[in-house]
Amino acid sequence: MGTNDLDIEEGTLEIGMEYRTVSGVAGPLVILDKVKGPKYQEIVNIRLGDGSTRRGQVLEVDGEKAVVQVFEGTSGIDNKFTTVQFTGEVLKTPVSLDMLGRIFNGSGKPIDNGPPILPEAYLDISGSSINPSERTYPEEMIQTGISTIDVMNSIARGQKIPLFSAAGLPHNEIAAQICRQAGLVKRLEKTVDLLEDHGEDNFAIVFAAMGVNMETAQFFKRDFEENGSMERVTLFLNLANDPTIERIITPRIALTTAEYLAYECGKHVLVILTDMSSYADALREVSAAREEVPGRRGYPGYMYTDLATIYERAGRIEGRKGSITQIPILTMPNDDITHPTPDLTGYITEGQIYIDRQLHNRQIYPPINVLPSLSRLMKSAIGEGMTRKDHSDVSNQLYANYAIGKDVQAMKAVVGEEALSSEDLLYLEFLDKFERKFVMQGAYDTRNIFQSLDLAWTLLRIFPRELLHRIPAKTLDQFYSRDSTS
């Protein structure tokens, strides 16, 4: 009998019993008959005829029949020599503070030639449900160093907000930049609190890549190592040539690690998941293999619920210092925001950051289009005591002026520049400078929130005071004057 390397708790099932009752293989699934007492989500060890072993998980139970998804793929599995051992345990992952600075594959095994992890605990990758009354409302801003996000789509600690991208757009570069620069806002007037709860030592990043190619994986590894941010990053890599089924457990292992770092070690964890479109495709593949009734575009009808089991693991808990903030990244097929993956993601998450192809084609980096972007929890993360008292008003005025500038630009294409008023020309000037100076910044150009707000005021001073309708007179008195040192 094969030995089981997972923690086994005693149950009604006879632990370690092996079966040679494989009746069929369908895609990533193995079907077994005559199994005594199989449990949903139970882990099984599969030994092939050549002696190699694989792991799987029970997906469906029907009497004595069990359907098992194999994490390493079903190639080489036959019904004559393959034995399946039921462990009586759900899938658990070892967790430890030592996981920071390490690189793992999609199943949570180290691939950086380092020593094995000495686990401080084994945790169920599905996570434990959080009592809604114990959740704390997300507050305090996570600073990304990117002006369009920090000023106009501020991310609160404990929020979940996705990046909507598409093929060929620089979402990987933006994700790497956020990893390099992300941290809590440093407020000089609260130095004691800053050291205790907001220090860089208390900030960690868990990065999970699903279905990425080798070039992308090397890009992230090299970027983290060269920029010295690797020591606070835990990296999980599921490559495009790894088994598709592994993509279903990769984000869950990453989030289980994040939960341990946040709620047991008191760290503020930023979880970046890329690419959730690959995850959804893996879900569709398993659903098709199980011959389930397909939903929109072949995706399973339960995909909304399944995505929610990942996204809803972000947040803060009463009485715990740590927090989990999620930034999932997904690529929209054919730039279609109505595709099921971005559509359902937008319903669950608290806003979105939209990466725009037109801005990218005009050599503007990062090509974040602020008009379709939104952060629903922004108001709780900004303002006096958290960022600056003018933050909300400046953001509203930038949105208003940029939207008017876009309308004027469209009108100019119809009637020509000669037909525009002097006021319209101001909006056109603002539009150009906003994109070239505010939106555009280097991949290694870090702007703190105060620098970004000052830059925003520089742009708003293009207009006379009477055109800044969204900003109260008191705020204008303090910040509008050109020699203001805010």
Curated annotation (Swiss-Prot):
BP GO annotations: actin filament bundle assembly; actin filament capping; ATP metabolic process; glucose mediated signaling pathway; negative regulation of actin filament depolymerization; regulation of transcription by RNA polymerase II
Principal subcellular localization: membrane
Domain of life (superkingdom): Eukaryota
Matches recorded under InterPro entries: ATP-synt_VA_C, ATPase_a/bsu_AS, ATPase_F1/V1/A1_a/bsu_N, ATPase_F1/V1/A1_a/bsu_nucl-bd, ATPase_V1-cplx_bsu, P-loop_NTPase, V-ATPase_su_B/beta
Topology term for the membrane: Peripheral membrane protein
Keywords: Acetylation, Hydrogen ion transport, Ion transport, Membrane, Transport, Vacuole
GO molecular function, one term: proton-transporting ATPase activity, rotational mechanism
Localisation: Vacuole membrane
Gene Ontology CC terms: Golgi apparatus; mitochondrion; nucleus; plant-type vacuole; plasma membrane; plasmodesma; protein-containing complex; proton-transporting V-type ATPase, V1 domain
Alphabetized SUPFAM superfamilies for the sequence: P-loop containing nucleoside triphosphate hydrolases (SSF52540)
Family of this protein: Belongs to the ATPase alpha/beta chains family.
Subunit and interaction comment: V-ATPase is a heteromultimeric enzyme composed of a peripheral catalytic V1 complex (components A to H) attached to an integral membrane V0 proton pore complex (components: a, c, c'', d and e).
Physiological role: Non-catalytic subunit of the peripheral V1 complex of vacuolar ATPase. V-ATPase is responsible for acidifying a variety of intracellular compartments in eukaryotic cells.
Stated name of the protein: V-type proton ATPase subunit B1
Organism: Arabidopsis thaliana (Mouse-ear cress)
